[in-house]
Structure formats: C-alpha cells, structure tokens
C-alpha cells in the first residue's frame, strides 16, 4: 500500500511538471541563444521553458532571476535549502544523478555544475538531445557573476542577469569596505555534524567554506588537507581557533553552544574558552550563489567584533517569480 502511494505521488509530480512545460514567449527562442559552458564550448539554448536545475547556487540564481516557474525538478540539496523549490520533484544528489528519472520529466534544459555526475549520466543527457549547460564549479566571486550572466542569457533574461551581477558587486564592495576597517585576523574553524553522521567534521581547503572564511578576513587553520575530515582532539587543539563557525542546523542538532563545546578539542581552544561559537544560515555554504556578497558581509561582522555592535548585516533580497 505504501509503495502504491509513493508511486502515485511521483506520478502526480511528473504530471504536474509536464503540464508546466509549455513554452512561453519569453522562454522559447526559436533561433536560440549561444552561451559558453565550463569547457569553453558554445551551447545553443532554444527552449528554456522546462528546466532541471542541479546545484543550489544554480537554483538560487534561477529564482533570483524571476524564472522559478520554469523549474520542474531539482537536486536534493536545492529542495532542502531553497524553500521555493521544496515541493518540486527531486532528481537525486548532484554527484549521483539518474538519467532515467530526469529525462522522465521531459526537460528542455538541464543546468548543472562541472562537479555534477556521474560523467556518463551527463553524456546521456546530451546524447538524448536535451540541451545541457554545464557551468564552472570553482568557488570565486568572479565565477558567480559569470554563472549568473550565463544562466540569465540562457533564459533570455540578460537585463535581469546584469542587474543581479551588479548587485553582487555592490554587496562585495560593502563587505570589503567593512573589512578595510577591521584590525583582527581571526583563525576560524568550520565544524559540523550531519543528521546521519556519528562524528563531527571540520573543513580544510578547497571548499566553499574555506573561500568564505578568506573573503571575510579570517584564516582557516586547517590548511594541511583538502575537503573535510573528522575532528580529533589533537588537530583542533593544535589549530587553536579564535572562532568556531557552524551552520544553524548543525548547531541546533548538536545541542547549541554546550553541545559544540563537547566536539573533540573545542573546549580547550581559545574559541571554546571564550565561547565564540557562531552559527550562520546553512545557505552560506551550499555553493556560491548570488547571495555571496551579503553572506560575506555578515561574516565580516561576526569575525571582527571591533567593527562595533551597531554594524548590522544587510537585509536579504527576495527573489521574484515569473508569471506564466
């Protein structure tokens, strides 16, 4: 009975998605527009009325451009962290996509990053005739703006894309103006614990977190490894972080400050002794998206208390919806 109910629910998702895939005057360009993908090749997009978006930053960008109504399926992380896409069909984790499930939604355009996969599935999308736009997956502010402009052009929304890219510049200018006033250079250790993870982990280099720490004027003391590792007493104590950074969900899951102080070594660090454990919204570390400048500005304020309590984070901008 449960299996039958799940099947009917998935069928309803697909039916709804297919009904939404009707080209509109502003999403169907008969001659097509040409955009450059991560490999430097030109991709011609002639119909963007029915989009599968893989990657939270890509999904965030599409909604920020006001084209959320064109999205008919997203990866699991997008569904989890971007409220507007929570009820859409999920196509799996970005690194383990299934061609059958995605192609069943009859997309006209698939947008993903270069780290999506497996590679053979991406090739299946292309071989099936579905326009597939693969974007860079490196973590820099300049890459964010390139991706915003590329996605906007692929959706025939270039003016909105330019406006969004300019807003990123403005947000980063505000963040850097604050940073220029800062006098400290704190060692910032990012830690976390997933819902199904028995042990807490910490971030090394080569992650969105590492780059965000750098942009906000901090120093990641875990520079000897890439990616993530389980926390150990010795590594954390030797790192001697001034501040512990953690996502809000992980903070709550761990039992707040008292729970984080029980993570390996934390209580013996300057951050632990001074209770400088700072939770931030999870979206900050879900890939660089158009909100990167606002996120950096808030982190600058949290990292550098000498800037003063009166310095407030900039308000978040809301994404508009495109009307059909």
Predicted regions and their residues:
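Structured C-terminal subdomain patch of bacterial secreted/periplasmic proteins
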Residues: 23, 143, 149-153, 162, ...
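Extracytoplasmic ligand-binding site segments that recognize negatively charged/polar headgroups
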Residues: 118-121, 133-150, 184-208, 252-255
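A short, structured surface patch at a secondary-structure boundary
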Residues: 50-105, 109-114
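Short helices/loops that flank or line small-molecule/ion binding pockets
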Residues: 99-106, 232-240
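Bacterial Sec-exported substrate-binding components of ABC uptake systems
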Residues: 2-6, 19-59, 159-190, 243, ...
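Short helix-initiation/N-cap motifs at beta->coil->alpha
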Residues: 36-38, 89-100, 138, 225-233
């Amino acid at each position: 009975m449960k299996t039958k109910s799940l099947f009917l629910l998935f069928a309803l998702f697909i039916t709804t998605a297919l009904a939404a895939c009707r080209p509109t005057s502003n999403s169907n360009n008969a001659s097509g527009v040409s955009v450059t993908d991560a490999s430097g090749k030109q991709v011609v997009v002639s119909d963007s009325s029915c989009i599968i978006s893989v990657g939270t930053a890509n999904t965030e960008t599409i909604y920020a451009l006001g084209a959320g109504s064109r999205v008919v399926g997203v990866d699991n992380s997008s569904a989890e962290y971007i409220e507007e896409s929570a009820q859409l069909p999920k196509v799996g984790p970005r690194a383990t996509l299934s061609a059958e499930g995605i192609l069943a939604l009859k997309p006209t355009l698939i947008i993903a990053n270069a780290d999506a996969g497996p590679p053979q599935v991406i090739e299946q999308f292309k071989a099936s005739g579905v326009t597939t736009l693969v974007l860079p997956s490196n973590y820099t502010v300049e890459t964010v703006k390139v991706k915003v402009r590329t996605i906007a052009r692929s959706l025939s929304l270039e003016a909105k894309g330019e406006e969004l890219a300019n807003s990123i510049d403005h947000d980063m200018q505000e963040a850097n103006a604050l940073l220029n006033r800062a006098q400290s250079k704190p060692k910032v250790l990012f830690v976390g614990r997933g819902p199904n993870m028995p042990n807490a982990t910490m971030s090394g280099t080569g992650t969105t977190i590492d780059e965000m720490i750098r942009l906000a004027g901090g120093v990641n003391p875990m520079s000897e490894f890439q990616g993530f590792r389980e926390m150990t007493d010795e590594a954390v104590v030797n790192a001697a972080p001034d501040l512990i950074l953690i996502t809000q969900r992980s903070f709550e899951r761990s039992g707040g400050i008292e729970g984080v102080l029980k993570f390996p070594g934390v209580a013996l660090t300057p951050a632990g002794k001074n209770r400088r454990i700072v939770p931030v919204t999870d979206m900050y570390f879900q890939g660089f998206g158009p909100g990167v400048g606002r996120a950096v500005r808030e982190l600058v304020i949290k990292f550098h208390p000498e800037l003063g309590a009166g310095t407030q984070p900039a308000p978040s901008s809301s994404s508009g919806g495109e009307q059909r």
